[in-house]
Structure formats: C-alpha cells, structure tokens
Amino acid sequence: MSRRALPSPLYAILDPGQSKGRPAIRILADLLNGGAKLLQLRAKEMTSNEFYRLAIEARELTRQAGCLLIINDRVDIAMASQADGVHLGQEDLPLETARRLMGRTRLIGISTHDLRQAQDAAGADADYIGFGPIFGTSTKETGYSPRGTATLKEIRKAVKIPIVAIGGITEDNVTQVWDAGADAAAIISDIMKAEDVAEKVRRILALR
C-alpha cells in the first residue's frame, strides 16, 4: 500500500465550468504562477475530445512547473495525456481495475464520505483519499451532509494514507482542516472565483 506523501498542502481543482468565461489555460497558468504543485483537472461539462485536448495542454504546463496533474474520473484521459494520476468517485471505475491499467507509478485517489469508505479505499491500495464534504458546498451536490472537522480527525486516526479534505473549504477555514489532520485541502470555488487567482493561491499557501 502506497505511503507516498503529497507534494503540497493545497490540492487545487481547476473546473472550466466555473471559469467565469476565462480560458481554462489562463487560469491554469495563474494557478502555477501562484505556486500550485498539486492540481486536479475536472471537466464534467466537456466532451471527451475537449477534455483530452485540455489535458494535453495542462500536462505540458504542469510538467514545466513541477506540478502533479491529476485527472478527475477519466482513467483513459489520464493515461492518454500522461497525467500523474486519476481521482475516482465511489461510482467510477473500480480502484483495482484502474490500478491494473495505470500501474504503480501513477497516483490513484478515491472520494470517500464516511469511515468505512475511507478504510476500504486505504485497504484497496489507494494512494490517497479525498474525504468530505467537510463544510457545506455549492460546487456539486454530493448527497452527503457536511462531515465537519471532528469526523475528519476520526478518519485521520483510522487511515495511514494521505487525506485530501474537500467541500466548502476556503482561505478563511483552510487551517481548520489542516489542523484536523488533512495532508492537503482541495479548494475549488474560492480559487476559481478569485479575481487574482495567483495571489489567492499564494495567500492560501502562506497559511501553512
């Protein structure tokens, strides 16, 4: 079971659907200029072809910046773009199948929402788990109520692999999830809505 440490306390998520009309590549450049070293590319509203082309561009820029690139949901696009890994939800391709396809050099993360899911993912050889939602979130409907930092602390005690906390996390509350044991905090809306994305990333990283 992998114990590979995550390279950054910030797990930035780039979602073109929240870009406020700005080109996704421009936002990516701003994220990297701000110091992002761990990035997930999520593009649920794009066609497969559009997502693939964006992933190829993102791979080149993230490689130059020394930033890990994780593709949301799509093992095929992660492999085709030579991304560093994939993040899977509970209803996506089974972890063991993704591992067989992607091998052990690429990261595989799993979304979890309770203790059993977290333990199952850790036992099934995930490289890290996403856990949440920690706080209320408007980004996407999870079907789960906010878990809070107390539950996050319980998860931290129960699993040894890295934890990425997600759900309603902002610059204002990010230290709460770090203090509760998260190795990294996934932030979407607070970054995507920022007028100055690079400066937002710098401020968040400065808190750690």
What are these regions (language model features)?
Residues M1-L93, R100-Y128, Y144, A150, ...:
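Conserved N-terminal beta1-alpha1 strand-loop-helix module at the mouth
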Residues A180, A184:
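C-terminal binding/interaction regions
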Residues Q82, P133-F135:
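Active-site beta->alpha loop and helix N-cap motifs at the rims of alpha/beta catalytic domains
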Residues V86, A185-A186:
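Paired acidic/hydrophobic, glycine-rich loop segments that form the ligand-binding mouth/hinge
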Residues T139-E141:
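Glycine/threonine-rich flexible loop motifs
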Residues F135-T137, G148:
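Short, local alpha-helical segments
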